[in-house]
């Protein structure tokens, strides 16, 4: 059963206005979206974005004229806001950056190290290179880099060596094969957490270009949101959280220039318009972690736009 992470905290943070316009940039199974819709009146509007065809197929099955589904990447959020004439008029945007329940449970998607299935890992399995294609063709240097940088895995050399030795004999086709290789490389060193956790995260992030997608979206969201509008993020690992935290802090404090640097006064004034009001991060309650284990690594950050650029 799908349980949306930190649902009450999201609704409180996004501060819904009944006739407002909102964007759920990561629709997934629609748990957060359904709750947002329930708070809107007949004049309210909810745009939902997802690059997973199955998620958007589900969104399209919801018969509600207030709901506008978009199949695409949230990095194009500015383009969508212009197309649907909501640029600068959005009262709230939600980014729930975790995998959806359906993606984890569907063994054919290849996201989970707990279920055997084809090694795919694409958010949109109609486009792009699969994890299977990449893992069987990338050189050892690239595999090491991805597992180290995107998984923060300290045994990246051991894992990449085992992978490259094995594929000389046969291709790696399934999640189970990859899990077994990672176990062989470093399983002994992991007692509490699954040894494949970090490597699967790393490969998924690389295959879907997740961090770059997030950075591209962050470049535009302040322009899209209206004054007093809220931006809410839920992240599940430190790489995403650091990017989000840096974005919020950089847009909520004054820029300081070196003394006597030749910069126009108008630029200094413009750069020192505070764009965001930063709120303290929120983590799931002990009670939520007990009934929804997926939430244990979640961090919610949110900010409010103070004025136009």
UniProtKB/Swiss-Prot annotation:
GO biological process assignments: rRNA base methylation
GO molecular function, a single term: rRNA (cytosine-N4-)-methyltransferase activity
Protein name: Ribosomal RNA small subunit methyltransferase H
Chief site of localization: cytoplasm
Signal peptide region: none
Family stated for the protein in its record: Belongs to the methyltransferase superfamily. RsmH family.
Its biological purpose: Specifically methylates the N4 position of cytidine in position 1402 (C1402) of 16S rRNA.
EC numbers: 2.1.1.199
UniProt entry keywords in alphabetical sequence: Cytoplasm, Methyltransferase, rRNA processing, S-adenosyl-L-methionine, Transferase
UniProt xrefs under InterPro entries: RsmH, SAM-dep_MeTrfase_MraW_recog, SAM-dependent_MTases_sf
Any one GO CC term of the record: cytoplasm
Listed NCBIfam families: 16S rRNA (cytosine(1402)-N(4))-methyltransferase RsmH
UniProt-annotated location(s): Cytoplasm
Binding locations of S-adenosyl-L-methionine: 30-32, 50, 74, 96, 103
PANTHER family: 12S RRNA N4-METHYLCYTIDINE METHYLTRANSFERASE, S-ADENOSYL-METHYLTRANSFERASE MRAW
The keyword Methyltransferase appears for this protein: yes
Top-rank taxon, per record: Bacteria
UniProt keyword Nucleotide-binding, yes or no: no
Reactions the enzyme catalyzes: cytidine(1402) in 16S rRNA + S-adenosyl-L-methionine = N(4)-methylcytidine(1402) in 16S rRNA + S-adenosyl-L-homocysteine + H(+)
EC class of the enzyme, as a word: transferase
Classification via Pfam families: Methyltransf_5
